[in-house]
Amino acid sequence: MKRGGIVNAQLAGALARLGHTDTLVVCDAGLPIPHGPEVVDLAFRLGIPGFGPVLEGILEELVVEEAVAAREVEGANPDCHALLASRLPELKLVPHWELKLRAADARLVVRTGEATPYSNVILRCGVPF
């Protein structure tokens, strides 16, 4: 058994398969999930698991060179915006409709049980060197 980190086998494997410039979406329970990407659905009940803990776990595993969230998060969900801004200095904000369009090009979608508005982010993988 792993000592720590992500112990969900499907999620750990999906993250390990990501390469430089691949994108993944970490989303709330309400974001429409496109049909193309691999999906790891972690949602159990509304609010469980939350967006923050899932994002934090993923950020411990990945190098991120760009992050994109919906501009609407600033006003509708200031706690989520604060988390994103503090953990992702490369964060760019775009209209929510654009975020949904970009999500269709992701290689992986990780759905959480989060039930607050605009708790979504697209991460583009970087390299550790």
Swiss-Prot record:
Annotated Gene Ontology cellular component terms: cytosol
Signal sequence residues: none
GO terms of molecular function: D-ribose pyranase activity; intramolecular lyase activity; monosaccharide binding
Catalytic activity: beta-D-ribopyranose = beta-D-ribofuranose
EC annotation from Swiss-Prot or TrEMBL: 5.4.99.62
Keyword tags: Carbohydrate metabolism, Cytoplasm, Isomerase
Main location: cytoplasm
EC class (word): isomerase
GO biological process: D-ribose catabolic process
The UniProt record lists the keyword Lipoprotein: no
Residues that hold substrate according to the record: D28, H96, Y118, S119, N120
Classification via InterPro entries: D-ribose_pyranase, RbsD-like_sf, RbsD_FucU
One Pfam short name: RbsD_FucU
Subcellular location as annotated: Cytoplasm
Domain of life (superkingdom): Bacteria
Catalytic residues (positions): H20 (proton donor)
Gene3D superfamilies associated with the record: RbsD-like domain (3.40.1650.10)
Pathway the protein takes part in: Carbohydrate metabolism; D-ribose degradation; D-ribose 5-phosphate from beta-D-ribopyranose: step 1/2
Family: Belongs to the RbsD / FucU family. RbsD subfamily.
Known function: Catalyzes the interconversion of beta-pyran and beta-furan forms of D-ribose.
HAMAP family membership: D_rib_pyranase
Quaternary structure (record): Homodecamer.
Protein name (database record): D-ribose pyranase 1
Organism of this sequence: Rubrobacter xylanophilus (strain DSM 9941 / JCM 11954 / NBRC 16129 / PRD-1)
